[in-house]
C-alpha cells in the first residue's frame, strides 16, 4: 500500500525540500502552499500540488475532498507552513496577531482536525514550531506574535497526544532554531546561519517517518543557533 504524506508550506525553504525528499523515497505527496507553481514546475509524478491558504476555510474542504476521493488514508501530516512577523510590540496591531495566528495556530488546528479521520495507528502528525516558542528559551524583541503562536502549537501537540492516545496516532512537535530560509531573510535582513533548508529537511524527513515509533506528545528542540 502506498504511503501518503501531506506537507504544508511547500513553495520554498524546508517544505520545498521535504517534497523532493518524500517524492524520491516513493511517497505519494500532497504539497500545499498559496503558490503551487514551484512544486508543479518540478513535474514529479507522485506529487499533487494545488493552491492552498491556511486562513481560508474553503481550502480545507478541497483538501478533505481530495484525500477522501484519491487516497482514503494519510500516514504523515507535516504542519510546516508558517507566518513570521518581526515588528516592535508597540506597533503590532490586533490585525497583525490575527494574521500570524490564522496561519500558525488556527490553520494548524483545522488542518489536523480535517485529516485525523483519515489517519490510523502509527500515523504521525508532526508540527514545526520554533525555539522562540519554548518556555525558558532565549527570546527576541519584535517576535511577540510569532513566538507566542509557536508556543501555542507546542501545547496543542501535547493536548492532541492525550486526547487521541487510544487511537495509536502520534503527535510530535519540533522546535527549530534558525534556518537560512527566505522567510528568515525577509524578517531578519542580513542575518546568516549555517543551517540550510535541505539539511533541516533531512532531519525532519527522518523524524517524521520514524519518530512516532519512539515519541508521542513530545517537544524536541532542533537547534544549534537561535532564533
Range-by-range predicted roles:
Residues 166, 173, 189-227:
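C-terminal helical subdomain
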Residues 25-40:
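Conserved glycine-rich Rossmann-like NAD(P)H-binding loop of the short-chain dehydrogenase/reductase
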Residues 11, 19:
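N-terminal Rossmann NAD(P)H-binding glycine-rich loop of SDR-like oxidoreductase domains
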Residues 80-85:
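Conserved NAD(P)H cofactor-binding loop of Rossmann-fold oxidoreductase domains
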Residues 126-152, 157-158, 162-165:
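Catalytic loop of short-chain dehydrogenase/reductase
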Residues 44-58:
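Rossmann-fold cofactor-recognition segment
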Residues 88-89, 96-98:
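Substrate-binding pocket helix/loop in short-chain dehydrogenase/reductase
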Amino acid at each position: 500500500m502506498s504511503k501518503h504524506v501531506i506537507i504544508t508550506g511547500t513553495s520554498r525553504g524546508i517544505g520545498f525540500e521535504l517534497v523532493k525528499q518524500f517524492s524520491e523515497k516513493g511517497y505519494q505527496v500532497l504539497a500545499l502552499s498559496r503558490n503551487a507553481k514551484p512544486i508543479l514546475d518540478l513535474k514529479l509524478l507522485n506529487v499533487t500540488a494545488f493552491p492552498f491558504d491556511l486562513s481560508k476555510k474553503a481550502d480545507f474542504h478541497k483538501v478533505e475532498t481530495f484525500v477522501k476521493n484519491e487516497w482514503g488514508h494519510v500516514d504523515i501530516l507535516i504542519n510546516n507552513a508558517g507566518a513570521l512577523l518581526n515588528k516592535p510590540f508597540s506597533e503590532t496591531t490586533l490585525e497583525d496577531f490575527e494574521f500570524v495566528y490564522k496561519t500558525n495556530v488556527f490553520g494548524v488546528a483545522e488542518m489536523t482536525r480535517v485529516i485525523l479521520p483519515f489517519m490510523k495507528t502509527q500515523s504521525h502528525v508532526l508540527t514545526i514550531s520554533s525555539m522562540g516558542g519554548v518556555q525558558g528559551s532565549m527570546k527576541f524583541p519584535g517576535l511577540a506574535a510569532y513566538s507566542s503562536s509557536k508556543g501555542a502549537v507546542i501545547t496543542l501537540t501535547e493536548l492532541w497526544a492525550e486526547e487521541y492516545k487510544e487511537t495509536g496516532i502520534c503527535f510530535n512537535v519540533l522546535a527549530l532554531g534558525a534556518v537560512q530560509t527566505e522567510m528568515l531573510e525577509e524578517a531578519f535582513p542580513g542575518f546568516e546561519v549555517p543551517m540550510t533548508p535541505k539539511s533541516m529537511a533531512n532531519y525532519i524527513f527522518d523524524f517524521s517517518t520514524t519518530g512516532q515509533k519512539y515519541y508521542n506528545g513530545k517537544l524536541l528542540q532542533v537547534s544549534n543557533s537561535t532564533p
